[in-house]
Amino acid sequence: MAVEYLCKVCRGHLKVKTSIVLAASKTNSPSRGLIFLNPKIGNYTTTTHPSFQIKEGEEYIYNCPICHSQLNSTKYKHLVRIIMIDDLGKEYNIYFSGIAGEKCTYKIRGNKIEEKRGPDLNVYNKYFDIPEEDRKYL
């Protein structure tokens, strides 16, 4: 079984061939389009149509292209959440920054960080590197 990526709401498959496909838009802007993300954790290459340019430093709203649900986390500001199922059938929450150019990814199973990558981790470690009972105060 190959690694799969799913919408956190409808559980529809987001990985097509070699990319994770999401819809992206900017708040208060008509600019929107599809973005193809590399599914390898730690690889931050993206592809968009030439008419839809992602601007570094700006925050985007990410939606499932199937059910159109917003994938940006309501719990962790500036992070986006999707689900990953590995080749053994284990399920993980994948969090990545919704701010273009920020490079950080968290792979979490239950309350345990299984993997974290990227030079911008220090911005978001506050959400994950504290005891569970204290997270409610964030």
Model-assigned labels for residue ranges:
Residues 7-10, 64-67:
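Short cysteine-rich clusters marking metal-coordination/redox-active sites
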Residues 45-56:
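Short, intrinsically disordered, charge-biased short linear motifs at domain edges
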Residues 31-40, 92-100:
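Short, structured motif recognition centered on aromatic/hydrophobic residues
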Residues 14-21, 74-78:
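Short Cys/His-rich "knuckle" micro-motifs
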Residues 2-4, 61:
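Residues immediately within or flanking Cys/His clusters that coordinate Zn2+
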Residues 65, 88-138:
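Preference for intrinsically disordered or flexible, low-complexity segments
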